[in-house]
Amino acid sequence: GPNYSISDLFNYTYNTNPITFPATFPALEGDTHIRFGNAYLSSSRLYTNPLAYMSSSFRETNYNTLNVSMSLEQKLDFITEGLKLTALVNFKNWSESLYSRSMTPWYYRVSDDGWSANAPEKFFIEQIGPNGSDYISQSDLTRSTDQTFYLDTRLDYSRTIDEHSLSAMLMYMQREFRSNILPNRNQGFSGRLTYDYLNKYLAEFNFGYNGTERLAKGNRFEFFPAVSAGWVVSGEDFWEPMNDYIDFLKIRSSYGLVGSDETGLAAGAAHFLYQNEVAMNSGYGFTTGAAGEYGLWGPNVTRLAVEDAHWERVKKFNVGLDIRMFEQLNLAVEFFHDRRDRILMQRASFPAIMGYVDSTPWSNIGKVDNKGIEVSLNWSKQLFNDFTLAATGNFTYTANKFVYKDEPDYPYSWQMDTGKPLNRMTGYIAEGLFKDQAEIDAWPDMSSFGNAIMPGDIKYRDIDGDGRITQEDMVMLSPYGNIPRIQYGFGLNMVYKKFDVGLFFNGSAQRNIMINNIVPFNADDFNGEQNLMKWIAEDYWSTSNPKPNAVFPRLGITQAQTSSNTVGSSFWMRNANFLRFKTFELGYRFPYCRIYLNGDNLAVWSPFKLWDPELWHNSYPLSRTFNIGAQFTF
């Protein structure tokens, strides 16, 4: 398979100027290699030829997985009816072996004196850059393995006596994952007790008593209980007059605790939180001798043990409603509120003067709220003998915020994360583009960005009023970020005689994206010289196009010349809501066969027009596909 990133290949292809050099030059008699085209980006640096990048290496990977499970089940009715013992043991061994083969491409260009404008079809080429290789080289074989051992033993009890139903479960679990020698271990107990009376009154209690090796003794195990209850209102006698309209109505709610022992890992916390980590020869030491000619490295504490570390915890509350109307319409509505606390994070409020060089302490102090509502709907009805119509829909709204986050002592409240959404848009408030030098001279100082401010650059609002544009002037531009708060979908299915039609739409709302880090701003990421997007080339600020509302500020030769324009600001924030015509299918049924035509990703509607609003500008685009097929039934 390919030995490269598909996204990188797409970016190189997307950003390489197609007229700078050809992908290849014609082969000559006796050639033992492909003549890839290229050119000098600088005195010694070549461009990236996407075809050469794709063709220069590949890899072969072999995976082996051994998965063995054994379970035993024993009914214990001789003790009490409905009691059962189950034991499960699972062992999985996974291994990977990988090697790659590669060659160094040969690059060529048209020589400076090797062509004539009068006869452009005739030219001479010359080799550039380091010599390539005519033969493929092979890497060493790389092997990786891991093993997982899992054990659980459980007692189940289920029994119905008259109008009472009772079930219970008690389980012990142990898991060990071993990779790179050091194992990961978890163990714990869990249980569940469920009761219902007349299928109308429902109650459940469950718990987990879980342990992790990441924490110190005394804190490794924690108890996580949860309770839930439900009431089938439509089962009551007083509801009978309503059964013709609402034949099922259930109210349900739950509250409980859930724990996670992976807290802090994504942010860089140590695996064993209760241990100090010390590095030798890490750049800290002392010198001695009359002339300071002797130096010795000393130990450096790179991670401090987390005192009294605990499990991260989520307090989850849900309340829901399930309704069925006219035996046709099913509606489920659920509200949820999660309070996540004990989030492990570094103490940003501790100043460096306290002596924490590489070992800023961690603490279980973060708190985050997440709440929202979920709605799902299904409806189906046979309108007349030959025609049936069905509809489905779903809607989700979620919002979150930092309840508490340890932060530095900021001078202004708008710099704080606490009390604000996690996924918000932050940046400078843009006030348009500078029209001339006189306006620049009268504007608050913008030298902190490092480039010479010129007409056509973006001007920013001085929020703190100190006469300078600095990071203290960055504010929350929108509570909505690139993760939508609202996601929804709806569809229809129709059957008429032997024809059937189905379609589905999905979309998102309350979503913004920031497009400041796009070409040509990110030129250094790939080739250093890239194409301009059409919308930029058609409407950027210039002396010949001094529009105060141009869609793009002035251009520069290098990124450093326009660094003030690349920062996040309201100038670059865009509404990325969208509605997508996701799928469509038309079918016709014969006695033993159904033929169909379907399509995927048929259309998208959005106020954002530059590219697919669900993707980023350099992402591989979603394909629009059509299929014709047949399904046979015998």
Q: Where in this protein do the model-derived segments appear?
A:
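Short helix/loop capping segments that flank catalytic or ligand/cofactor-binding pockets
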Residues: 95-98, 262-263, 438, 502-504, ...
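Glycine-rich, charged/polar anion/phosphate-binding loops
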Residues: 303-305, 474-479, 485-490
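Extracellular/periplasmic, surface-exposed regions of secreted and cell-surface proteins
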Residues: 1-102, 110-423, 427, 568-634
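Conserved small-residue
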Residues: 267, 382-482, 522, 533, ...
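Extracytoplasmic gating/loop element in the C-terminal half of outer-membrane beta-barrel translocons
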Residues: 51, 115, 451, 455, ...
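Glycine-rich, aromatic-lined ligand/substrate-binding cores of catalytic
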Residues: 81, 481-514
